[in-house]
């Protein structure tokens, strides 16, 4: 029994130690990272806070009903001195003690500011702030997704580069062996052998550096997903053939639909509403109030008679002079409104500029990819032909090395253009998903 238990335990521990997270697409990785990102969690909490502020603002304009209970034990009843002329004696005063030892007063009272226009405006402002918080949370998510996409596709590019480097290392190893064979047969001198070895060492060093870059890119993905660096993360997707985004470019024509523009526009509305609210504070407060109370006094706790009292009334209150505070508040709110409008105009201008830049970058990247893909294909074909000629002693090593250098340059250019394409693609798709 113990042996079986230990076997099961070892299998469980082995499974736990080799557990890993695997993602097949960017969307799957992004969903996981967004779900676990602390900034996104804080944005969700801020949204809930604004919702509570909205509910609180509603409560501020509703009637207030209070219940009270007062029990007083008059250890020494207060004495009232009444001066006067008593029994023909002037400058005489009499002392009286009023009340009982115990005084009990339960009751209810209610009040309602029926002309709280500023409070009603604050409800509308709080509702708008709640919408802004929701949009801001979406904006944070979109910005994070852009960062995630940049890091994700950067990792895919490092993996693609590794494939090129591994292939180049295999090629240089083949050249090194061919040169060594020729050297033994007396067909080439030591210089050519050493040059093939040098190229092979360069490729080996490049492989080591490329692997380090890939590891760093993978660690960055772990950090963005809020994973410990010791966690095993596997991305199975590879760089795909670029697809046309012409249908998505239409979204770049209307900058007002961008989340940044929506947030800026809502802030203008809130600033305008704040200005209105400050102006409404000039109106007088009109309060309705009412109360209903019971009172009982006695020298000991007993079933004494209860006396009732109730009242209703209307109270109108306004500030005649308050040091100009209301005027200053209105002016400050108006300046904030003007500032918010400037921010909106600036946001729309920047979005328009960014949209046009994205459009041009996309068109250029598509054209460049078409050319570098053809260049890479030709360079690979040229190297195949040159290697064949070199193997058959038709082409000298210097010319083979030149063709090989052209292939390396074509590979590098291809990766650079693919990287530029995905950078533009991520930004455009982030806008489309808004």
Map each language-model feature to its residues:
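Small/polar, glycine/serine/threonine/aspartate-rich low-complexity segments that form flexible
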Residues: 21, 68-108, 112, 236-245, ...
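Periplasmic alpha-helical coiled-coil/stalk elements that build and connect Gram-negative outer-membrane
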Residues: 28, 52, 137, 141-255, ...
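Bacterial Sec-pathway N-terminal export signals of envelope proteins
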Residues: 19-70, 76, 225, 229-269, ...
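Short segments within alpha-helical structural elements
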Residues: 205-227, 377-434
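Sec/SRP-type N-terminal targeting helices
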Residues: 41-45, 58-59, 101, 114-141, ...
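Bacterial Sec-dependent N-terminal signal peptides
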Residues: 1-30, 34, 419-421, 428-429, ...
């Amino acid at each position: 029994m113990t042996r079986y238990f230990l076997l099961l335990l070892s299998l469980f521990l082995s499974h736990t130690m080799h557990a890993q997270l695997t993602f097949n697409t960017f969307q799957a990785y992004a969903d996981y990272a967004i779900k676990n990102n602390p900034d996104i969690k804080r944005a969700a909490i801020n949204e809930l806070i604004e919702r509570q502020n909205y509910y609180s603002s509603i409560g501020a304009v509703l009637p207030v009903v209070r219940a009270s209970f007062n029990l007083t034990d008059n250890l020494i009843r207060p004495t009232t001195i009444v001066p006067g002329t008593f029994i023909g004696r002037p400058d005489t005063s009499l002392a009286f003690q009023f009340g009982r030892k115990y005084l009990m007063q339960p009751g209810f009272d209610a009040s309602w500011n029926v002309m709280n226009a500023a409070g009603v405006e604050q409800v509308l402002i709080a509702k708008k702030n709640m919408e802004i918080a929701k949009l801001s949370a979406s904006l944070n998510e979109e910005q994070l997704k852009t960062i995630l996409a940049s890091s994700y596709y950067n990792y895919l590019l490092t993996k693609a580069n590794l494939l090129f480097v591994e292939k180049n290392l295999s090629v240089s190893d083949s050249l090194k062996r061919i040169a060594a064979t020729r050297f033994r047969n007396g067909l080439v001198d030591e210089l050519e052998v050493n040059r093939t070895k040098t190229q092979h060492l360069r490729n080996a060093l490049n492989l080591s550096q490329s692997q380090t870059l890939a590891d760093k890119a993978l660690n960055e993905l772990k950090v963005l997903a809020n994973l410990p660096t010791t966690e095993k993360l596997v991305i199975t997707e590879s760089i795909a053939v670029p697809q046309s985004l012409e249908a998505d470019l239409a979204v770049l024509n209307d900058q007002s639909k961008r989340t940044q523009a929506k947030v800026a526009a809502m802030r203008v509305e809130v600033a305008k509403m704040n200005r209105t609210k400050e102006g409404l504070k000039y109106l007088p407060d009109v309060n309705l109030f009412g109360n209903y109370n019971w009172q009982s006094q006695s020298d000991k706790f007993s079933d004494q008679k209860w006396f009732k009292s109730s009242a209703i009334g209307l109270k109108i209150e306004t500030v005649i002079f308050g040091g100009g505070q209301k005027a200053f508040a209105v002016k400050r709110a108006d300046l904030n409104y003007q500032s918010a409008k400037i921010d909106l105009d600036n946001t729309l201008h920047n979005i328009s500029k960014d949209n046009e830049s994205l459009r041009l970058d996309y068109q250029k990247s598509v054209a460049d990819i078409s050319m570098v893909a053809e260049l890479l294909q030709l360079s690979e074909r040229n190297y195949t032909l040159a290697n064949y000629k070199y193997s058959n002693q038709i082409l000298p090593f210097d010319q083979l090395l030149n063709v090989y250098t052209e292939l390396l340059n074509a590979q590098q250019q291809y990766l650079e253009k693919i990287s530029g394409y995905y950078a533009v693609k991520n930004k455009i798709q982030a806008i489309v998903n808004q």
